[in-house]
């Protein structure tokens, strides 16, 4: 399948998908920073722009749809999908924002969810029999997270936490089964990621054992 997504090292910001001035975006960002300083619940830039009547709800939905498709297309697992397929699969994903030092995947817990890291930084880790943490890897955008639980009935095989404020896309495994099992390029890429992550985990655990 032809990939029509323009490859960039970093995903594009939402403002690049909206037909509004940079000044309007700066005002929205200022309001977001003010809310943070006051300890109030922070809204997304798009929501603030709608409240300011700079854009319409429909404009925001369309921009998010296009941004989501681009971000998913930058993920190694889904980069072979066409533009139409990326927009389609994007309907199953939603945006998640997390603060720094926030553990959101817990080893041994049932969480049938695939995440895509689109901004920020994550740490993957496990624990030995004594409860000591074993660092496995740091993960940077754009990479899938939580994929190894797919073949474990949703049980996570490692823990993951944010290192800095992080943006993710998330979707339930059940929404992605068709792509993982019936789209060859996606299935191959998905298995490649799993094999690489398994090798990293085994290597880190061996290194930790050798240090004792």
Locations of regions flagged by a protein language model:
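Regulatory nucleotide-sensing modules
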Residues: 73-125, 144
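Cyclic-nucleotide recognition modules
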Residues: 134-191
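Short hydrophobic beta-strand motif reused across regulatory alpha/beta modules
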Residues: 49, 54-55, 117, 122, ...
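A short, compositionally biased micro-patch
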Residues: 109, 117, 129, 153, ...
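A small-molecule sensor/coupling module
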Residues: 68-69, 82-88, 156, 174-212
